[in-house]
Amino acid sequence: MAGWHHGRRVKKSTAVQEALEIIREMITSSDVEENLRLPSEEELALRLGISRLTVREALTILEREGVIARIQGRGTIVNRFARRLTSRIDSAREIGKFIAENGYTVGVDNVQHWWQAATALEAKKLAISEGEEILLVQKRFLADGNPAAFCIDRVPKKLFCDFNFSTADLEQAIFPFIEAHCRCQLTHDVIEIIPAVADTKLARCLQVNEGTPLLRLDAVEYDLEGRAVMYNTEYYLDHFVRFTLCRIVSYMT
């Protein structure tokens, strides 16, 4: 089918996640027309080097998200609004990807990390005891060199299997770092959306005035076994990052 040439193939270990990522790239690419019928499950499986079952799982997720519709007799159709669903807030992704999806070159600076005792709130979020040691990582994200977001990551020390890392390692994406050093597979997160304003520290970090409105996301990342692995607090400037969400209409008749 024209318009669907793609060179990436999927690694078996994260087949569904990678299949989702690649199909999303296909759908939002500039050379793909809206409302284009997707290739068959068999063809997608062949192109991505995965099973039809894995493709079916990925398509089921995309259908649930509202990106595609499977219509009997017509196949799998890309919904017209799919391209507008950038920076989806219902998809757990790295902050850098959200910034890139909004058209900016991503940078990271001011990375700091240390070990500290968990507060009562941190302990509750991570399902550990208050006072247990956690790794705390702070970093600032840039959009075309301008401050765009500030993130605080917290991970229980007891989950680490490998303590051989440096600040330079933490400048990279946090999800692969956690999976490698805690030997787990992150599968989903639960987020809270909290209106916030910049205090003195955030104003200085993000180069805005105190009291500037910010979007705050609190997220707890879970692994395949359902363990709370990481608790994140993220602050965004809305002129650099705008989130979208496709909601299913539900009403009482």
Per-segment meaning from a language model:
Residues 1-50:
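Extreme N-terminal segment that seeds HTH/winged-HTH DNA-binding domains in transcriptional regulators
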Residues 63-73, 79-80:
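Beta-hairpin "wing" of winged helix-turn-helix
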Residues 16, 40, 77-91:
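Short, cationic-aromatic polyanion-contact patches
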Residues 3-7, 82-253:
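All-alpha effector-binding/dimerization core of bacterial HTH-type transcriptional repressors
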Residues 59-60:
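Short, hydrophobic-biased segments on the C-terminal half of alpha helices
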Residues 54:
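Residues in the helix-turn-helix
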